[in-house]
């Protein structure tokens, strides 16, 4: 399966193919001339796939060095980025060379940020190995690192030269890590794909989580939602905000819990349920939709709440949200399953959305 992210200045393909990891050398050779490559990966994923990827790249003539960092959201910071910049410089990486991200969302965000800022920008590729990264963060060009104030506070818009998705690598994910990715899948269904919602409704949790039943179709449909939105609104000024359903509160949960304690997809699930509950009470979403969302979230083992729920700390984190404009935050609501809408909320009104 192949999707084309047809952006005017930087179009690229997203390849979805079982066993694709075995053909990385051929794929990269089709996109880049022989050059130096820095492979960026965390210690866990690098241990699983790093040497195989390096061997294939070297076999077709690339010179490769691997920058490895400690697994987890806590590593997505300025210190890790600086270490990566220095590593690239010591390896002699120039603007004609490239960076490959091999890993989950943290790796993709970090590697993309490093690539977009090193020497004012060099080429990079995404090889996502988590469900969250495959269906969401590897596509669209958002890169970033966290600060103590907010998630992804420092970042760029920089598109990759290509994305290679191998669903087979999901077999090495732990169940929590796989379920976390379903938070983003459920979001895609809610904002833009009712057929995907129906597919998730019909699937049993065991068939999907343990057997990866229908996983290629689920990845493809989720990527197609992301592709359409990114092509329509590359820089996040309009409809691309729909992809942030559940993220305003979700990012605040991640920040206040301490990065890594609540996984991103888990926080998105919590955020979708919480904002829907209050929006439904305000008459902005149809009666009963929150229960539908909560039922779907819980079906796949995702949380629908978080403790301790500290409204003051969450509100403080929300004030640094990237969707804020002045004293207004553009939140996302779902008028019906398969559609999304922007709902502008003042900071003061946002306090209502944090009430349990």
Swiss-Prot record:
Q: How is the cofactor bound?
A: Binds 1 divalent metal cation per subunit. Can use either Co(2+) or Zn(2+).
Listed SUPFAM superfamilies: Dehydroquinate synthase-like (SSF56796)
Reaction catalysed by this enzyme: 7-phospho-2-dehydro-3-deoxy-D-arabino-heptonate = 3-dehydroquinate + phosphate
Which positions bind Zn(2+)? Answer: 184, 247, 264
Chain positions recorded as NAD(+) binding sites: 71-76, 105-109, 129-130, 142, 151
Q: Which UniProt keywords apply?
A: Amino-acid biosynthesis, Aromatic amino acid biosynthesis, Cobalt, Cytoplasm, Lyase, Metal-binding, NAD, Nucleotide-binding, Zinc
Which cofactor(s) are needed, names only?
NAD(+); Co(2+); Zn(2+)
State the Pfam families in the record.
Answer: DHQ_synthase, DHQS_C
What are its GO biological-process terms? amino acid biosynthetic process; aromatic amino acid family biosynthetic process; chorismate biosynthetic process
Its GO CC terms? cytoplasm
- Identify the pathway: Metabolic intermediate biosynthesis; chorismate biosynthesis; chorismate from D-erythrose 4-phosphate and phosphoenolpyruvate: step 2/7
Q: Name where it's found.
A: Cytoplasm
EC number, UniProt record: 4.2.3.4
Job of this protein: Catalyzes the conversion of 3-deoxy-D-arabino-heptulosonate 7-phosphate (DAHP) to dehydroquinate (DHQ).
- PANTHER family the record matches: 3-DEHYDROQUINATE SYNTHASE, 3-DEHYDROQUINATE SYNTHASE, CHLOROPLASTIC
Annotated protein name in UniProt: 3-dehydroquinate synthase
User: What would be the name of the gene that encodes this protein?
Assistant: aroB
